[in-house]
Amino acid sequence: TFKIDTVTQENLDEKLSTYLSAGDLLLDLAWNIDANAIIGWAHDHGVIYLNTSVEEWEPYAAGATRNPTERTLYWRHMKLRKLTDTWGGKGPTAIVEHGANPGLVSHLTKKALFDIATSAIKDGKVSGIEQALSDENFPVLAQKLGVKVIHIAERDTQISDKPKQVNEFVNTWSVEGFYEEGIAPAEMGWGTHEKSLPVNAYQHADGPKNQICIAQPGATTWVRSWVPNMETTGMVIRHGEAFTISDHLTVWENGKAVYRPTVHYAYCPTDAAVASMHELQMRQWDLTENQRIMNEEIIDGDDRLGVLLMGHPYKSWWTGSLLNIHDSRKLVPKQSATTVQVASAVYAAVAWAMANPNSGYLVPDDLPWREVLGFAEKYWGGYHSAAADWDPLMHRNDLFKGWNNRKYDESDPWQFSNFLV
């Protein structure tokens, strides 16, 4: 039985208490319900909890007058840590940010590191990593492999027989969710190999300081990237995996971060969504009420979603899903490749949480990667995992090179400045 209701700051306790009791599972797929409020409630009432994003009641409050660092997911994660640190790792399981991405991509990152290391040992490309591989010590493994950059690299090529109309926002998932992420500051895990900060970058004053943000929308911050078998340009949309992956892969020595890769989303959505986001910019970020999530009208295309690890002996390595619309409909009728990827990743986390109901507060990187990937594998069309001969300076065609003051670091292709479009 489905019941439609509204949860507000004032009625959260009343509404949740009406439907939930200790031992139940609360699956939070809503937007603009404060994470601290709802996760705190679930913890206090013995309810298992899972969401796909860390939300606030009023994400647009204060607008441009708010410090860019306070408009980041890093800021929200620090608030969550202050709450959950008092729990001592105990209580009902509460997993945050476990959809496809953020979520399953954290496990794909570990699979990619495992596959790279296994191949590198077999091919005689590296030595001295056997212990880190055996222990699945992924921070040290990434460090020893020389991983410098990780893109959550996605290219969605799904097309429909219903063209986007003028002043219509079309997407393959939540329009409101894409809007909020798109207008927020570009945000990324910042690697220890990076030589200089981007223009208008801001650093954080407390916490692990593993991230930076840029005072411009993620939707207008484009980088070069790659998915099988094509080069892409993607938006540096803020996403929780940029925080958790870069945090979990940091190597610390005497309180100093001596190794960390740069980690961020590089998202190229459908042609209709790209046009919609461009139109949104023309409207001065005033979101139209005319919105559509493509589904049954999709006639072709796929959603290539995975992680691109760069800087190791194979140059680049992509691990992820190549699920197309035709195969996704065989798996789950009347659904798109995007919704099948996301829903199955949520299912994977739910399955684990139900089997482990008293594990306290967790991010995706805390879960057993093989087990969770196993739950979702069928619905992702299996996992493609292979090397790629690519870096951001290859095939780069700068039409005004030498005249535009654009400088490239030829000595280190993995500098963030080399990726920027």
Regions found by a protein language model. Name each.
Residues 22-23, 92:
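Local beta-strand N-terminus motif with an aromatic residue
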Residues 115-421:
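C-terminal catalytic/substrate-binding lobe primarily of soluble NAD(P)-dependent oxidoreductases
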Residues 98-107:
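Domain-scale recognition of functional cores that engage charged ligands
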Residues 24-27, 50-51:
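N-terminal Rossmann-like NAD(P) cofactor-binding module of classical short-chain dehydrogenase/reductase
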Residues 36-47, 52-90:
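Rossmann-fold NAD(P)-binding glycine/threonine-rich loop
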Residues 21-22, 109:
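Alpha-helix C-terminal capping/helix-to-coil transition sites in glycosyltransferase folds
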Residues 7-9, 27-35:
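N-terminal glycine-rich "phosphate-gripper" loop used for MgATP/nucleotide binding
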Residues 6-20:
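Conserved Rossmann-fold cofactor-binding substructure of NAD(P)-dependent oxidoreductases
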